[in-house]
Amino acid sequence: MKLKLIAIFAFAVAVIAVGVIRTTSTIQRKNVPNKDRLKWYAKEAKNEGRQKVTMAAPLVEYLGGAGTITADDAFAASTVVIAHLVSKQSNALNDDITTWNRFAIDEVLLEAKELPCPTCLPPEPPPTLLPIKPGEFLIPKTGGTVNIDGVDIEQIDEAFPEYQFDQRYLLLLNLYATGTARTVGGPVGVFKIVENDRIVPVHESEHRIQKDFKLKFGNSLEHLRKHLKVR
């Protein structure tokens, strides 16, 4: 039994080390270069007659991602809005894919008095996405799909699902004067508004903010709105 567990562990390490090309029908292991990875994936896919490749997104550390930050800590330095996705555009950047999500604000529940990191530079969108209209903002997110040499390359962040159209979101934002924004703690500050105005996280975690939303507000938009009005 011990030898079997050792063998399974060794296999798992090997898979992580070599990288993965994932297609609709097979998973093939290859040595992935550190530079020009997206072009390499496209070339390998074409050589194998594939038209689509799926790869994992890199790990990202987000401002506000510390699990001990409470909901009230986040409210003290964030803008809280209800918004919906208007458009999205994916771009290849530094051997990874970034998707710029354009949101329209439906309601502002709370405006931040100051940014948690005044010296942090705001996200810089591609010129093609400018100008940003009043009442809209742009959020960059790792992952998305781009086409390189006729091959669709999809990068997936399993801990931070893609934003969806026809879905209302409650967002905890670091909103900059430029009209760009980041969500507090990445996926931690993103909630879907579902039936009966319930607010549910896009990705379940043990983060204190999500626990507070459940225990203090009962995942209720109405209860949250009342709490924010008296701040």
Which role does the model predict for each range below?
Residues 2-231:
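Transition segments tied to proteolytic processing and entry into folded domains
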